[in-house]
């Protein structure tokens, strides 16, 4: 008689764990959309996704852990999206423009997640994952510096310290997107960044071109 092989349950279990984790993060984002970062709570998350208190604590420890985990998930998603646009660009001008439009397009496509990044940053910076935030921000910045350096050496961009380049290129689009996200409704609402996509990209290139 052929022996029966008991199917492994590790993959489904892992998938279920991942799904539950994501359910909790989605619920936390929904809380933040309704009332800001301060509205994220264990009870609020539990009510929205049906996770047990034990499950929430198992995955994230506490409310601060949920906020930080959601922040880093969104932060890394944004970084990957912008990096993909930069990698696809051909030439320094196209690359500079891709940094701006990649960031802008990501924000416009998912404003709730983008708003959470701005809102939660100070809370994460003041919490136990401060070193993780510093490391993630530094890693992203250093990747941009490394991209600009050969172009600076080749004379394609201004002969400025490359550590300044990310601020010159990304500063304006980040500032406008932040202002737009802070008040998307009412008579004082700003025009969507999508309308100024070309202007912001062109301004970034003018700021650094040789």
Kindly label every feature range from the protein language model.
Residues 20-28, 45, 70-74, 78, ...:
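Generic hydrophobic, amphipathic alpha-helix propensity
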Residues 1-8, 105, 138-153, 172, ...:
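C-terminal peripheral helix-coil segments that are non-catalytic and often amphipathic
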Residues 108-128, 178-182:
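Amphipathic alpha-helical segments used for helix-helix packing
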Residues 76-84, 127-154, 163-167, 175:
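Amphipathic alpha-helical packing segments from all-alpha helical-bundle domains
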Residues 17, 67, 71, 75, ...:
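Amphipathic, non-transmembrane alpha-helical scaffold segments
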């Amino acid at each position: 008689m052929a022996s029966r092989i008991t199917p492994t349950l590790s993959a489904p279990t892992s998938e279920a764990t991942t799904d539950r984790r994501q359910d909790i993060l989605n619920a936390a984002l929904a809380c933040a959309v309704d009332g800001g970062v301060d509205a994220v709570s264990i009870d609020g998350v539990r009510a929205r996704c049906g996770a047990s208190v034990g499950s929430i604590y198992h995955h994230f420890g506490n409310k601060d852990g949920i906020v930080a985990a959601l922040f880093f998930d969104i932060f890394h998603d944004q970084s990957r999206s912008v990096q993909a646009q930069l990698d696809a660009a051909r030439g320094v001008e196209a690359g500079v423009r891709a940094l701006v439009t990649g960031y802008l397009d990501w924000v416009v496509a998912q404003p709730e997640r983008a708003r959470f990044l701005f809102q939660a940053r100070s809370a994460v910076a003041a919490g136990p994952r401060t070193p993780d935030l510093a490391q993630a921000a530094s890693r992203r910045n250093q990747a941009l510096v490394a991209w600009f350096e050969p172009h600076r050496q080749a004379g394609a961009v201004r002969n400025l310290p490359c550590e300044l380049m990310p601020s010159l290129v990304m500063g304006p689009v980040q500032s406008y997107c932040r202002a737009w996200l802070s008040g998307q409704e009412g008579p004082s609402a700003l025009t969507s960044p999508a309308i100024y996509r070309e202007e912001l990209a062109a301004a970034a290139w003018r700021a650094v071109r040789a």
